[in-house]
Amino acid sequence: VLGGSYGGFLTSWTVGHTDRFRAACSERAVNYHPSMFGTSDIGHLFNEVEIGGLPWEMPDKYAERSPLTHAKNIHTPLLIIHSEDDLRCPIEQGEQLFVALKKQRKDAVFVRFPDENHELSRSGKPRHRLERFRIILDWFTRRLAPEPTRGR
């Protein structure tokens, strides 16, 4: 499973709630709503509408709707891709989930792109877009390859 932006959020959320997938890639995702509220260029608007209030009024609801809260349930190998200059979904969103997974010794890789923003996959530097494609292709190729069979 793979997604970016809201799709990245859904990817992070999904792997925290099912082990159905053999590999996942979450790009430029919101992973922790309480910090997105104050760090994203739209966090103070989006989260209030999407969650239905302010973080200090409903901290439990903000946390419950955050993939980071469910990191203990993530068993799917997860590739996290983020751009360093992303103001929509700041890079700390990816860093928080990555650190949570590594602290639990889970299979996670974090790839950061310097001098790129939320639009990396659509209008980023050509060399970065190509590198991103190669990283994703390699990630899924290695994790989805058939397991070797044992001969007799």
Over which residues does each language-model region extend?
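Active-site-proximal cap/loop segments of hydrolase catalytic domains
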Residues: V1-R152
